UniProtKB/Swiss-Prot annotation:
Assembly mode: Occurs in many kinds of cells as a complex with monomeric actin in a 1:1 ratio.
SMART domains membership: PROF
An MF annotation (GO) of this entry: actin monomer binding
CDD domains per record: PROF
UniProt modification remark: Phosphorylated by MAP kinases.
Listed name of the protein: Profilin-4
Localization per record: Cytoplasm, Cytoskeleton
Length: 131
């Protein structure tokens, strides 16, 4: 299965008539493996800061998580494995795998819990596959 198929079929999937606003799979080096058409244009330093927070949990808390110029308030995640952010009625979930970061961005009516399930389920599967 191509990386784009993982984004299209697993991340941008229909959940009770709703779906993520945007999604992507990005390598630890900041290279885009696959993304939805709606995923924001991001800066390399934004991905570098996210990677740093996985290595040093809590480093994003004072400044927030920035992606494509949007600032998300960092909320409880799983240190070294999952970062969650909130902005207004939406937010972001980032799951780290061995080689990549899985991004899911959502807005109401999709819930934070639904976004977490979508992103973390694919991330866990990729971890099991050695990715």
């Amino acid at each position: 299965m191509s990386w784009q198929a993982y984004v299209d079929d697993h991340l941008m999937c229909d959940i009770e008539g709703q779906h993520l606003t945007a999604a992507a799979i990005i390598g630890h080096d900041g290279s885009v493996w696959a993304q939805s058409a709606t995923f924001p244009q991001f800066k390399p330093e934004e991905v570098a800061a996210i990677i740093k927070d996985f290595d040093e949990p809590g480093s994003l808390a004072p400044t927030g998580l920035h992606l494509g110029g949007t600032k998300y308030m960092v909320i409880q995640g799983e240190p070294g494995a999952v970062i969650r952010g909130k902005k207004g009625a939406g937010g972001i979930t980032v799951k780290k795998t061995g080689q990549a970061l899985i991004f899911g961005i959502y807005d109401e009516p999709l819930t934070p819990g639904q976004c977490n399930i979508i992103v973390e389920r694919l991330g866990d599967y990729l971890l099991e596959q050695g990715q």
